[in-house]
C-alpha cells in the first residue's frame, strides 16, 4: 500500500489507517490487493476534527462494500498506542474524522527546532532529475512584466521541488534562429542608417523601441560608417548577432537582479549546428510518424490525441518552430532528465497536445512533460490601470517594476494568485509600508519576532530549547491554531511540489502572519511568569523559523528589523 507522508501527525495518522486496513485483511474482513493511497487532509473546520480521510469511500469500489461499513471496520481496528487521538468519528458517506489530543500539538514544535531551516524539506524526489525551463523570451528586447511573472513562477517551482529532494536544473531556451531575430537585425540596421542621415522606410515588422536606436548608436560610435559599404545581408547578420548579444546580457543581468540565475542558456542555433532537428525528423520518419503531402512533411500527432496532424517541414524545406521544439525536448531527455517542466504564457495553451504528442512519439510518457501556464498581469497604480505599452510598442519592463517596488515586493506580488489566473499588480500598494502590502505584512511578522527575541536577550532571558519549556502551557485557542498552522507547512510544500502551484506558499504565509499578528496584539510573550515566557518565546522562535523557510522558498528576504 502506498502511503502519502506529510508532517509527523499526518504520517502517524496515515500509518494508523494502514495498520488498521492490514488488520482487516489479516482477519479476512477485507480482501488483499493493491489498495489506493491513504490520503489524509487537515480539515478546514475543527468541528470535523483535525484531520480526515476519504479512504473508505475510495475503497468502496475495490471492496464492493458500503463505504460507511468500511469506515466502521477500519475505525474498530485502530490501535492508537501513542495516544495521539482524543476520538474519531465517521461522517457523511464514509469520511473518518480524527480529533488529535491538545497536548500532542505542542510536541510538534520539537521537529521545527531540530530541523531548523530544513523544516518543510522532504525526500520525495530523491534520485530524480528535473529540468525547469522558463522565461525563454526571444532576445529581441527587454523582458516585460509578463515575462517577470513567469520568471518568478518558474524560479519558485524550482525552489519548491529542490526542497522536496529533486535535483533541479534551471534552463532558459534562447529562440535565436527565426524570423524575429532577422527582424531585430534589420531594425538596428535601419536605425544605424538613419543616424548617418539616410532616409529609411521603417517596416511595421521591425522593432520600434528606443533600445534599438541605442544599440545602433553603439555600433556607430564603435565602427563609424564602415557598414554602409558592406553587403546588406552580411550587415543584417552582423547587426542581428551584435544586438542579440547585448540584449541577452541585459536580460541575464535583469534576471540576476530579480534573484534568478539559470544553470544553462540553451541556444536554438545549437539544434541546427549539431543536426538536432535533422536527427529528430529522421527518428520520427523511421518510426513511421512522418508523411509527405505536396512537398510538405507532416507529423502524425493525431496518433497521440492531437486534433490534427502538424507540419514539421514547410514546402521551402525550412523546419517549423514545432520541429525545433520537439528536437529541443528530445535533447532534454538525452541529457538525462527524468521529467521536464515548461512554464508558458497562457496563450500557448493550444500548443500542449502537440508537444505531448511529440514526446510520446519519442518513447516518453506524457507525464514526462508538465506545462504550467501563466496568465497576464494587469498593472495598476492606486487601483487605476497603467498603460502597459507606449505608442511605439514598448512594454513596461520587468526592470522598471523591480526598480520601483523592489525585488521582494515584486516577487511576492507575482505569486498572490494561481499562475493560470489573471493578476492585478498595484504598484502603489506594493510600495506601502503597511499591512495593505502583503509582503510587508509577512516580513513585519518576522521582524516583530526578531524584536521580541532581542528584547528577551536584553533582559537576560536565555532563548529556550524544547527541553526547558512546558508545552502543555500552550493551550489557548490562538496558540493551538498557530501550532496547527506550523505543523501544516510540510504538507503545503508537498502539495505545492505535487501540483506545481507556488501560490500555495504565499497563501500559507498570509495565514500564518495573520495568526501571529493577532496573537501578538492580544497576548504578552514576555511576562513575569518565567515558565510561560520561556514557552511562548519558544513558540515564536518556531514561527520565525517557518516564516523564514517559506519566504526563502519564494526568494524573498526575511528582515530582522523594519
Curated annotation (Swiss-Prot):
Report the residue ranges where the short sequence motif 'HIGH' region is annotated in this entry.
Answer: 137-147
Q: Name one GO molecular function term.
A: arginine-tRNA ligase activity
Quick one: a GO biological-process term for this protein?
arginyl-tRNA aminoacylation
Give the main location. cytoplasm
Instruction: Name the Enzyme Commission number(s) assigned to this protein.
Output: 6.1.1.19
- Provide the Gene Ontology terms for cellular component: cytoplasm
Task: Quote the Pfam families the UniProt record gives.
Answer: Arg_tRNA_synt_N, DALR_1, tRNA-synt_1d
Matching InterPro entries: aa-tRNA-synth_I_CS, Arg-tRNA-ligase, Arg-tRNA-synth_N, Arg-tRNA-synth_N_sf, ArgRS_core, DALR_anticod-bd, Rossmann-like_a/b/a_fold, tRNAsynth_Ia_anticodon-bd
Q: Which PROSITE patterns match?
A: AA_TRNA_LIGASE_I (PS00178)
Which terms are listed as keywords in the entry? Aminoacyl-tRNA synthetase, ATP-binding, Cytoplasm, Ligase, Nucleotide-binding, Protein biosynthesis
Where does the UniProt annotation place the signal sequence? none
Where it sits in the cell: the answer is: Cytoplasm
**What catalytic reaction does the record list?**
tRNA(Arg) + L-arginine + ATP = L-arginyl-tRNA(Arg) + AMP + diphosphate
| Family, similarity comment | Belongs to the class-I aminoacyl-tRNA synthetase family.
UniProt xrefs under HAMAP family: Arg_tRNA_synth
Query: Whom does it interact with, and what assembly results?
Result: Monomer.
Protein name as catalogued: Arginine--tRNA ligase
Name the species this protein comes from. Answer: Syntrophus aciditrophicus (strain SB)
Gene, per the UniProt record: argS
Amino acid at each position: 500500500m502506498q502511503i502519502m507522508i506529510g508532517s509527523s501527525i499526518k504520517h502517524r495518522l496515515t500509518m494508523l489507517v494502514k495498520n488498521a486496513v492490514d488488520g482487516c485483511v489479516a482477519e479476512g474482513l477485507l480482501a488483499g490487493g493493491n489498495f489506493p493511497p491513504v490520503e489524509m487532509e487537515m480539515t478546514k473546520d475543527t468541528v470535523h476534527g483535525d484531520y480526515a480521510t476519504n479512504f473508505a469511500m475510495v475503497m468502496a469500489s475495490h471492496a464492493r462494500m458500503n463505504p460507511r461499513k468500511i469506515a466502521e471496520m477500519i475505525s474498530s481496528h485502530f490501535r492508537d498506542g501513542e495516544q495521539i487521538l482524543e476520538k474519531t468519528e465517521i461522517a457523511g458517506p464514509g469520511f473518518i474524522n480524527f480529533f488529535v489530543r491538545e497536548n500532542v500539538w505542542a510536541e510538534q514544535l520539537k521537529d521545527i527546532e531540530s530541523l531548523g531551516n530544513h523544516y518543510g524539506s522532504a525526500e520525495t524526489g530523491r534520485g530524480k532529475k528535473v529540468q525547469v525551463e522558463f522565461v525563454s523570451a526571444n532576445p529581441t528586447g527587454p523582458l516585460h512584466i509578463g515575462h517577470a511573472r513567469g520568471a518568478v513562477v518558474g524560479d519558485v517551482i524550482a525552489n519548491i521541488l529542490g526542497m522536496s529532494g529533486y535535483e533541479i536544473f534551471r534552463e532558459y531556451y534562447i529562440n535565436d534562429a527565426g524570423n524575429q531575430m532577422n527582424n531585430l537585425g534589420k531594425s538596428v540596421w535601419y536605425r544605424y542608417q538613419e543616424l548617418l542621415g539616410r532616409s529609411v522606410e521603417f517596416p511595421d515588422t521591425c522593432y520600434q523601441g528606443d533600445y534599438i536606436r541605442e544599440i545602433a548608436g553603439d555600433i556607430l560610435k564603435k565602427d563609424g560608417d564602415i557598414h554602409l559599404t558592406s553587403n546588406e545581408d552580411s550587415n543584417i547578420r552582423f547587426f542581428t548577432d551584435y544586438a542579440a548579444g547585448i540584449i541577452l546580457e541585459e536580460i541575464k543581468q535583469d534576471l540576476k537582479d530579480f534573484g534568478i540565475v539559470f544553470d544553462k542558456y540553451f541556444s536554438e542555433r545549437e539544434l541546427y549546428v549539431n543536426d538536432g532537428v535533422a536527427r529528430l525528423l529522421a527518428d520520427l520518419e523511421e518510426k513511421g510518424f512522418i508523411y509527405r503531402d505536396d512537398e510538405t512533411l507532416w507529423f502524425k500527432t493525431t496518433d497521440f490525441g492531437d486534433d490534427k496532424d502538424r507540419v514539421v517541414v514547410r514546402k521551402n524545406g525550412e523546419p517549423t518552430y514545432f520541429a525545433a521544439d520537439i528536437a529541443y525536448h528530445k535533447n532534454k531527455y538525452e541529457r538525462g532528465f527524468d521529467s521536464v517542466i515548461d512554464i508558458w504564457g497562457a496563450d500557448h495553451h493550444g500548443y500542449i497536445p502537440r508537444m505531448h504528442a511529440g514526446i510520446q512519439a519519442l518513447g516518453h510518457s506524457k507525464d514526462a512533460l508538465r506545462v504550467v501556464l501563466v496568465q497576464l498581469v494587469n498593472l495598476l497604480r492606486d487601483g487605476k490601470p497603467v498603460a502597459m505599452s507606449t505608442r511605439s510598442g514598448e512594454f513596461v519592463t520587468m526592470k522598471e517594476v523591480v526598480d520601483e517596488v523592489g525585488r521582494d515586493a515584486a516577487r511576492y506580488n507575482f505569486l498572490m494568485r494561481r499562475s493560470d489566473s489573471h493578476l492585478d499588480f498595484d504598484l502603489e500598494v506594493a510600495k506601502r509600508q503597511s499591512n495593505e502590502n502583503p509582503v510587508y505584512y509577512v516580513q513585519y511578522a518576522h521582524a516583530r519576532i526578531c524584536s521580541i527575541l532581542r528584547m528577551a536577550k536584553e533582559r537576560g532571558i536565555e532563548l529556550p530549547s524544547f527541553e526547558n519549556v512546558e508545552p502543555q502551557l500552550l493551550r489557548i485557542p490562538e496558540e493551538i491554531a498557530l501550532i496547527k498552522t506550523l505543523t501544516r507547512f510540510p504538507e503545503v510544500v508537498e502539495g505545492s511540489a505535487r501540483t506545481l502551484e507556488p501560490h500555495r506558499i504565499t497563501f500559507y504565509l498570509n495565514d500564518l502572519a495573520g495568526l501571529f499578528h493577532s496573537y501578538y496584539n492580544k497576548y504578552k510573550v514576555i511576562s513575569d511568569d518565567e515558565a510561560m515566557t520561556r514557552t511562548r518565546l519558544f513558540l515564536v522562535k518556531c514561527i520565525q523559523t517557518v516564516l523564514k523557510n517559506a519566504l526563502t522558498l519564494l526568494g524573498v528576504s526575511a528582515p530582522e528589523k523594519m
